[in-house]
Amino acid sequence: MTSSLVGSEMCIRDSFMDPEPEFTRWAKETGADRIELYTEGYAAAYGTALEDDILQPYVDSALLCDELALGVNAGHDLSLDNLEKLLTACGNIQEVSIGHALTVEALQFGFAETIRRYNELLDRVAAKPRVFPQE
C-alpha cells in the first residue's frame, strides 16, 4: 500500500491499496480522503471462473468506504473489456486510472474511437442502478 497524505485545500489525500478492510480503515484513521483500489487481481481474473470471487473484496471495500465516508478510486490493468463490470458492481467509484490499455486500444481502434467507446461505457454504467452484489 502506498499513501499520499498531504493535506491542503487543493490536494486530495489518497491511499493506493489492495481491497483489504484493515487497509481501508487505516486510510481513514490517517486522514485520507479517498482510497485507490489496486485492480490488477480483478483484471487478471476477469473472464475466468474466479471473476466473481475476486470481484467481491472490491465490492466489500467500496461498501466500507461508504460507511467510512471515504471516496473510492480504482486503477491498474483496467480496460474497455473489464471496466463496466467493476463500475457497476462498485457503484461509488469516483475515478479510474486507465493507462496502458488506453494506448493499446487507441492503436487498435484509433484514439477518437477509443474515447467514444469509454464515454459510451460510462453512459451505460451511469444509466444502471447502483449494484453491490452480496453473498
Where are each of the predicted segments found?
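C-terminal helical cap(s) of enzyme catalytic domains, especially alpha/beta-barrels
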Residues: 47, 51, 105-128
